[in-house]
């Protein structure tokens, strides 16, 4: 199935000069969504845990984890998770941000696969890798619906395997 036909270009969103890749048509098509989850599950079968960032990583990571009967670990921005959390501060283009996971959800040695919707510059994904590794997990792969290849985000991950179902240049 050609998933690219379910990703719509929206010019000048969210601001002038940006060509936004809208995945809503894919989510609104049951066959395309089912195909996407099955493809991601094939790629993620070696994981002990599936990890996804808020919010759109949840859209693909949770059903993939459920399909494989694997745990799904949420990575959220500061202050969005209850209980004790592990924090990781990382640099943005114009400042800093903080990602969190709940304490105790990662076991040392867990083989983790990160699933997300889009890879652009790779900054957030790199921060997730650092957070997981700080808890003893081994990130073995990154799986994405869409990779914006000209932004070269995968260069931040060294030799780590990156699987993208759709690759485009913006």
From Swiss-Prot:
Annotated metabolic or biological route of this protein: Purine metabolism; AMP biosynthesis via salvage pathway; AMP from adenine: step 1/1
UniProt xrefs under NCBIfam families: apt (TIGR01090), PRK02304.1-5 (NF002636)
Assembly information from the UniProt record: Homodimer.
Keywords annotated in UniProt: Cytoplasm, Glycosyltransferase, Purine salvage, Transferase
InterPro entries: Ade_phspho_trans (IPR005764), PRibTrfase_dom (IPR000836), PRTase-like (IPR029057), UPRTase/APRTase (IPR050054)
Protein's recorded name: Adenine phosphoribosyltransferase
Presence of keyword Ribonucleoprotein: no
UniProt GO MF annotations: adenine binding; adenine phosphoribosyltransferase activity; AMP binding
Compartments, as annotated in UniProt: Cytoplasm
